[in-house]
Amino acid sequence: MILATGVSHAYSGVDVLRDAALTAAHGEVIGLIGPNGSGKTTLLRTLYRALTPDRGTIRVDGVSIDSVRPRELSRALAVVVQEPAGELPLSVTDTVMLGRIPHLGTWQRQSQRDIDIAAEALDQVGAEHLVDRDFGDLSGGEKQRVLIARALAQQATHLLMDEPTNHLDIHFQHEILALVRQLGVTTVVVLHDLNLAARYCDGLVLLDRGEVVTSGTIDDVLQPAVLEPVYGIRMQRLVAEDGCPQLLFRSLREPHPGTHTHGSREHVEARVR
């Protein structure tokens, strides 16, 4: 379980996060959503101590992260962040094996079990064919899958992900998020795509200008009356055949959808990015 209460943070004296709260119960997938600059990534970074909040508390399974040693924290939290291309001058195998470091002693060498876990993680994200490549030579989407594999190899009890679907095509966007749900690991994930959030998250936290606007179930948060003032765009909520909510988006400059004929270009779905 991850519990954050009253979390605030400022950059150069400018508040970017104010009294944010978040609860991710055991096995839940909680999505952080909101426009660019709303504080999603800042909140996520405080959860794994990449940023120290000016105020507030963060607990993982009831223990304050401030009292946990780095190695212990790495066993509890696996993180997928948006890393610069080519930052890791390693092979794909070595990159994924980094996820096993929290489980090794100071002088302990990697075992066959560690190697098998890393290989399985690559297979889970559809990247087993990249095993002999250099990480720096991969495309953006390939790098993203390898970084997700590294987090999976860590076998932590909690997973934190910042835009894990970046650079991925539609197929792998759904494959990766479906995999995350199947893992049953407590997960907090930053997502821009609201329809992906609707399909794969158990609950959502909506941020805007550094504050939590609302949080709750998919049905609670993904309502036009809630989202339109935040995103500044017209929304229509539909329901897919499997019962999952789906949102259609239109610019506020366009007339109300009822004034258009079916098949017009204004009826084409556009994702909020």
Predicted regions and their residues:
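The feature captures the beta-strand-to-loop junction immediately N-terminal to the Walker
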Residues: 33-35
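Helix-to-loop junction immediately C-terminal to a conserved catalytic motif
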Residues: 48
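Conserved ABC transporter NBD signature motif
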Residues: 56-64, 73
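Conserved ABC ATPase "signature" region
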Residues: 97, 112-130
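Conserved ABC ATPase signature
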Residues: 109, 134-138, 142
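Catalytic Walker B motif of ABC-type/P-loop ATPase nucleotide-binding domains
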Residues: 159-163, 168
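ABC ATPase nucleotide-binding domains
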Residues: 228-273
